From Swiss-Prot:
Residue ranges annotated for the Peptidase M12B domain, each copy included: 197-391
Disulfide bonds: 308-386, 348-370, 350-353
High-level lineage: Eukaryota, Metazoa, Chordata, Craniata, Vertebrata
UniProt organism field: Calloselasma rhodostoma (Malayan pit viper)
Active-site annotation: 334
Regulation: Inhibited by EDTA, and O-phenanthrolene.
CDD domains: ZnMc_adamalysin_II_like
Annotated compartments: Secreted
Cofactor binding, per record: Binds 1 zinc ion per subunit.
InterPro entries to which the protein is assigned, alphabetical: MetalloPept_cat_dom_sf (IPR024079), Peptidase_M12B (IPR001590), Peptidase_M12B_N (IPR002870), Reprolysin_adamalysin (IPR034027)
Any GO MF annotation of the entry: metalloendopeptidase activity
Summary of the function given for this chain in its UniProt record: Snake venom zinc metalloprotease that inhibits platelet aggregation by binding specifically to platelet glycoprotein VI (GP6) and platelet glycoprotein Ib alpha (GP1BA). It inhibits the interaction between collagen and platelet GP6 by cleaving GP6 (at '225-Glu-|-Ala-226' and '238-Val-|-Phe-239' bonds), and inhibits vWF-induced platelet aggregation by cleaving GP1BA and vWF. Cleavage of GP1BA occurs at two distinct sites to generate two soluble fragments. It also cleaves alpha- (FGA) and subsequently the gamma-chain (FGG) of fibrinogen, leaving the beta-chain unaffected.
Name of the molecule in the record: Snake venom metalloproteinase kistomin
Record SUPFAM superfamilies: Metalloproteases ('zincins'), catalytic domain
Assigned keywords, A-Z: Disulfide bond, Hemostasis impairing toxin, Hydrolase, Metal-binding, Metalloprotease, Platelet aggregation inhibiting toxin, Protease, Secreted, Signal, Toxin, Zinc, Zymogen
């Protein structure tokens, strides 16, 4: 027997729809206010979770009913997910919060085969969804005692800076030049049957990020969760899962000088990751998030093909926009470089895919055929074992890959493109 619980709230458009409002994504010029109606199906006798595994919400967009189906992203967090910050005296504080009953979902719109959704339900509905080929954002309005939410399109957000935002990677080499000696991919029979790649990601936010949020590290942690949830929407069709291994906030001071040169900052972060982070936190990729304004139009940089090399599985990202979707695409782009993908070129026939060299104002959240080919070539040539095995804490800089044969020595210049 199924008991259907309906939370009945009227569906309405805000009477002053179209006026300007300041939301988390910035100043929004055109929006409508809706009151979502939650529809939850519970099995009789089922244990009530704070956040159900599946949920449905109804509301209207432009007068048309929308039924939003949501499923909890159960692979968003690693089992040993951790959060780290520092006390005023510099003591490192690491906690391991329970993350099974979390509030991050992916989904679709009923009767819209091309629809997608990436939503958090932590405090109302917050995120984005694709409906009839157009992308909409939704977030709760901060009105006491109200269930009102704003729904708006990306083009209705006032742009703070029209300057094109670029990835700093310059293409001048082919990925097969990186490793001269191929090695064997040693997988168990079970891993061979289900060869789903898993990126165990640690996000490190520097002091400038903490200052930007006035010391509220929960805001940074939520930003990280939201970005990774959205990145999974991009990566799952590629057979790749992005799993949050941890997030670290430098609440007291930076552990190296964060410079306006993205290249120098990437070098420094990669060095710190080897000497510090990798010795205490299992992961196979790390991304550095900073509010530092990088030189020129650069907002990100990463080592191409560095994912399973202990020295170079890293990238740096500037917090360049208030729009969570664009930040997720930016970090997802740099992780793509770590996975061997280069920039989309004219022949890729996709101007707004994830690996486009510029941050597009209307990204598709898809990878081009070129990106798929680069990734498949990376898997074939590099045999990246770390993507198919849970990472272990290591004190070593490089790992033997076939018997006692070590990786051939690779310099920074080999990876920096």
């Amino acid at each position: 027997m199924i008991e259907v619980l309906l939370v009945t709230i009227c569906l309405a458009a805000f009477p002053y729809q179209g006026s300007s409002i300041i939301l988390e994504s910035g100043n929004v010029n055109d929006y409508e206010v809706v009151y979502p109606r939650k529809i939850t199906a519970l099995s009789e006798g089922a244990a009530q979770q704070k956040y159900e595994d599946t949920m449905q919400y109804e509301f209207k967009v432009n007068g048309e009913p929308v039924v939003l189906h949501l499923e909890k992203n159960k692979e968003l967090f690693a089992k040993d997910y951790s959060e780290t910050h520092y006390s005023p005296d510099g003591t490192r504080i690491t906690t391991y919060p329970s993350v099974e009953d979390h509030c991050y979902y992916q989904g679709r719109i009923h009767n819209d085969a091309d629809s997608t959704a990436s939503i958090s339900t932590c405090n109302g509905l917050k995120g984005h969804f694709k409906f009839h080929g157009e992308r909409y954002f939704i977030e709760p309005l901060k009105l006491p005692g109200s269930e009102a939410h704003a729904v708006y399109k990306y083009e209705n957000i006032e742009k703070e800076d029209e300057t094109p935002k670029m990835c700093g990677v310059i293409q001048k080499w082919k990925s097969d030049e990186l490793i001269k000696k191929p090695f064997r991919l040693n997988l168990t029979p079970q891993q061979q049957e289900s060869p789903q790649a898993k990126v165990y990601l640690v996000i490190v936010a520097d002091k400038s990020m903490v200052d930007k949020h006035n010391g509220n590290i929960k805001k940074i942690e939520e930003q990280g969760h939201q970005m990774v949830n959205t990145m999974n929407e991009c990566y799952r069709p590629m057979g790749i899962i992005i799993i949050m291994a941890g997030i670290e906030c430098w609440t007291t001071n930076d552990f190296f000088e964060v410079k306006s040169s993205a290249k120098e900052t990437l070098y420094s972060f990669a060095k710190w990751r080897v000497e510090d982070l990798s010795k205490r936190k299992p992961h196979n990729d790390a991304q550095f998030l900073t509010n530092k304004d990088f030189d020129g139009n650069t907002v990100g940089l990463a080592f191409v093909g560095g994912i399973c090399n202990e020295k170079y599985c890293a990238g740096v990202v500037q917090d360049h926009t208030k729009v969570p979707l664009l930040m997720a695409i930016t970090m997802g782009h740099e992780i793509g470089h770590n996975l061997g993908m280069e920039h989309d070129e004219a022949n890729c026939k996709c101007k707004a895919c994830v690996m486009a060299p510029e941050v597009n104002n209307n990204p598709t959240k898809k990878f081009s055929d070129c990106s798929r080919n680069y990734y498949q070539k990376f898997l074939k040539d590099r045999k990246p074992e770390c993507l198919f095995k849970k990472p272990l804490r290591t004190d070593t800089v490089s790992t033997p890959v076939s018997g006692n044969e070590p990786l051939e020595v690779i310099t920074m210049d080999d990876f920096y493109a």
